[in-house]
Amino acid sequence: MNRTFRILAICLFALAASTARAQSPAQHIGAVLDDWHQAAAAADEARYFGHFAPNGVFMGTDATERWTVAEFRAWAKPRFQKKSTWTFKPHDRHVEFSTDRKTAWFDEMLDTLDLGLCRGSGVLVLSGGTWKIAQYNLSVPIPNAMVDGVVKQIHAH
């Protein structure tokens, strides 16, 4: 009886441990994005750009900033070399999936040191069993009460 109980306990423990490690698809996307943000903060260029799909696009806060991965990497390279990159702390993330579960889109709020509160949104594609960032869009949300003034400044620019 004691031996049977031990075997049963070991099996239940193994099952519980494997269930605890299993991530939902949304958690898996979150882990990819978290690692991507952490790679930027650590100035780990290879890890950071390894998260992009080959035909990925990064859109920055300026209207002129629509970069292919190669263009974005060229712009960012000096920052990674100097170890003076950026730190984004994500929260309030939402993830959705296509019906075939091969495409995911998300939005997240970001606490940043330089820009304050930002929003990131984007699309990931499943490629060879790995989620890759196909598009990322960084924006600075403007409170509605300030929009008119900001629009005037943009027009005057």
Predicted segments, located by residue:
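Short beta-edge strand/loop motif at the mouth of beta-sheet-based domains
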Residues: 67-69
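Surface-exposed, charged secondary-structure patches
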Residues: 23, 28, 58, 71-117
